Curated annotation (Swiss-Prot):
Its cofactor is heme b. One of its GO terms (cellular component) is mitochondrial inner membrane. Pfam families: Cytochrom_B_C (PF00032), Cytochrome_B (PF00033). This is Cytochrome b. Belongs to the cytochrome b family. The keyword Electron transport applies. It comes from Chaetodipus artus (Narrow-skulled pocket mouse). It is found in: Mitochondrion inner membrane.
Length: 379
């Protein structure tokens, strides 16, 4: 008799995706982040569901309902902090996952890569709308500033902003619709992640060498299930330490004050995971130009497959590209720091230089480095 996991229609799908999946024998721990992102999504959906049971999306009671969750609901404080810091964990894993893809040339699987970019946009939209829900000062003003950026779109901008707001300012209608979208988007993300996996399993995983691994495959279970499990244990240990000991470290103190349209916070800034894009937005003194740069800072990822000039896929044996890659990582860290600083010298010029460098490395220097390395290696 055939084993049920190989014959049952549903089990067969799971089997082909997670058990008998042929995987390269040499993939490193950098390949753990896909499964960790799945874990993050499950944590966020589960904790979010319990928060939604007690949250009210009304401007008069949203802030109080979050306080009620923390004070009166059994382990409400824990669920709230797991959800808030879970977003940070999600983005840490997401950025490391993208960095791995760039370093090892995984972007050459174009369909998987492009679906990944769609996933990044969806996750960013979800996180932004979630940040508005507690209805603190930074929630309100962050929502006002970021949605207002759409008014830079010629001709339809103002109408578009008022349509999103559901009125002439961020108010009850905005909060209600943001809650609705924040609730539904994670399920859309989960469905899109399935498509991401579908495309990945069409080609099979890349590996650190960037060469075909068809001649040397091993089953996903037990090898990579246990390897992933180690990553899960390490990440969860660090995450719970963070949640239980430093729950407010990454939050903004302004968000503990209720939203007040008559009082603007001294420095309006988003959560840390958006600061690099926020710095790029602020480095251009023109509103429309800033918005275009903001969108391009993420969309530029779609150009990686087109700008790949090297004859080797991975950066593992390409020292010039490696140097540029780590320069890009450092540049993103500088942009993140600048995004959290006030708009005054010397931060303005540092942000502008870092923004130019960000686009230069991706659009110009990495493709040139690839060509130089081809020459050096006489490939």
């Amino acid at each position: 008799m055939t084993i049920i996991r190989k014959s049952h229609p549903l089990m067969k799908m799971v089997n082909h995706a997670f058990i008998d999946l042929p995987a390269p024998s040499n993939i490193s721990s950098w390949w753990n982040f896909g499964s960790l992102l799945g874990l993050c999504l499950i944590i966020q959906i589960a904790s979010g569901l319990f928060l939604a049971m007690h949250y009210t999306s009304d401007t008069t009671s949203a802030f109080s309902s979050v306080a009620h969750i923390c004070r009166d609901v059994n382990y409400g404080w824990l669920i709230r902090y797991i959800h808030a810091n879970g977003a940070s964990l999600f983005f840490i894993c997401l950025y490391l996952h993208i960095g791995r893809g760039i370093y090892y040339g995984s972007y050459m699987y174009k369909e998987t890569w492009n679906i990944g970019i769609v996933l990044l946009f969806l996750t960013m939209a979800t996180a932004f709308m979630g940040y508005v829900l507690p209805w603190g000062q930074m929630s309100f003003w962050g929502a006002t500033v970021i949605t207002n950026l759409l008014s830079a779109i010629p001709y339809v901008g103002t109408s578009l902003v008022e349509w999103i707001w559901g009125g002439f300012s961020v108010d009850k209608a905005t909060l209600t619709r943001f809650f609705a979208f924040h609730f539904i988007l994670p399920f859309i993300i989960a469905a899109t992640a399935m498509v991401h996996l579908l495309f990945l399993h069409e080609t099979g995983s890349n590996n650190p060498l960037g060469i075909p691994s068809n001649s040397d495959k091993i089953p996903f279970h037990p090898y990579y299930t246990f390897k992933d499990l180690l990553g899960v244990i390490i990440i969860l240990s660090l995450f719970l330490t963070f949640v239980l000991f430093f729950p407010d470290l990454l939050g903004d103190p302004d968000n503990y004050s209720q939203a007040n349209p008559l009082n603007t916070p001294p420095h309006i800034k988003p959560e840390w995971y958006f600061l690099f894009a926020y710095a790029i937005l602020r480095s251009i003194p023109n509103k429309l130009g800033g918005v275009i740069a903001l969108v391009l800072s993420i969309l530029v990822l779609a150009l990686f497959p087109l700008l790949h000039t090297a004859n080797q896929r991975s950066m593992m044996f390409r020292p010039i590209s490696q140097l540029l890659f780590w320069a890009l990582v450092s540049d993103l860290m500088i942009l993140t720091w600048i995004g959290g600083q006030p708009v005054e010298p010397p931060f303005i010029i540092i942000g502008q230089i870092a923004s130019i460098l960000y686009f230069s490395i991706i659009l110009l220097l990495l493709p040139i480095a690839g060509l130089i390395e081809n020459k050096i290696l006489k490939w």
